[in-house]
Amino acid sequence: MSLKLSLVSLSNTDLPIETKQQALIDIVLRFLTPQERASLFESITHQRETNLLARYPEYQSKSLSVLFELMDYRDLVRLDPNNLHDDVYLLELTVAECFPHWLDFWCACEIEAIKQKYSLENREPATELSFEDASYSAMLIDDISKSSMRVQLPSYPVAMTLSDAVALSNLELFVQGEKWYEILPLLSLSQKGKHFILLQTQTTPVLVASALIQDWNQRNTWLSYAPQFNSEKWRFCLPLHGYQELNRLDILASDLVTDYGSLTVFDQAFQTHITKTEMVCEVLRLTVSGSVQHKLYFLYLAQKELMNVLFQSGYKVGFTIIEQAFMLNFYQSIDSKAYFHSGYCDINGDGINTYRGFWNFESMVDTFKRTDFRDYKRRIRVIRQNTQVNEHA
């Protein structure tokens, strides 16, 4: 049966929505190669983004999650038929009947494509995740696509490649959970390159946290320097002690001055001044897995181990982008030299600021030497009594 006939057959059935969703995913995975899927998903996404911005130009700078929820996707598909062949139009019509929108379907397909490589018939014995720091080990992997390590996830207890495990955890947390659809066309960054990983050590280690580490020579793919995070919409807020720390760390040819009028101008100056580029990186996609309580613990432990691993590897400063309230609240409670903001922006106009900032790895290591999980939670509880993040921290 062809793709078109399979879609017609599915459209004519009266199945429960969850069954129909799974059947549609299976059809796409069966008839399209990974390369064909990638091309199709990106083409339709680009066309629908263009259609939506033509209707709502005031949403030009909003995230894809906001943009794709502006109107009923079924109406969008009918009002603006895609300009590809009939099979694709029928596919999109069927997607619109089964999923909230195209990006939700894309994410579901990527998750299922990974899971179908590994049968749950080969599931690992049930694992109880510990709250003891000594049960975990942390390391930096130069290129996870070349690693022979096999790990499992709390959400999917089957031995799989490290690159698939990292990609699956990123999809489940950031895309499926937090609707960060911008990751989808850049999913390959979760499948290769340098990553920090945190494992519960056992016969088949359990991957409980990971983060993408990009060196200075990869800054063309840094999110910090992408247009959405490096525009005039961003409020520049680097504090005086931030300048002092960056100048003190011996990574610059000459001191930064304190009169940069915008984040964009500061970024340009930093790139001009930096000489010891091997000591600077960007850290993104800090992912944790498990139950709600375990995620909070792994967020604590992952930060603690991440700072130590990167500092021991010769890094002094890390660029990062944070919206996570627990992390921001904790940073307000510690030495202001350990983490400081460089800019912030309410990207979606929903009252939630996203922050760009710097980790000073040596100071962060010192902070976590004095902070156990109980103290971490206590600090967060105290800071949560305040209603705002201090953008000058």
Swiss-Prot record:
This protein's UniProt keywords: Autoinducer synthesis, Quorum sensing, S-adenosyl-L-methionine, Transferase
Keyword Nucleotidyltransferase: no
Biological processes, Gene Ontology terms: quorum sensing
E.C. numbers: 2.3.1.184
Pfam (any one): AHL_synthase
InterPro entries with a match to the protein in the record: AHL_synthase (IPR035304)
GO molecular function: N-acyl homoserine lactone synthase activity
Coiled coil residues, start to end: none
Keyword Lipid metabolism carried by entry: no
Superkingdom, natural source: Bacteria
Catalytic activity: a fatty acyl-[ACP] + S-adenosyl-L-methionine = an N-acyl-L-homoserine lactone + S-methyl-5'-thioadenosine + holo-[ACP] + H(+)
Family: Belongs to the LuxM / VanM family.
Name under which the protein is recorded: Acyl-homoserine-lactone synthase OpaM
Organism: Vibrio parahaemolyticus serotype O3:K6 (strain RIMD 2210633)
Classification of source organism: Bacteria, Pseudomonadati, Pseudomonadota, Gammaproteobacteria, Vibrionales
Gene: opaM
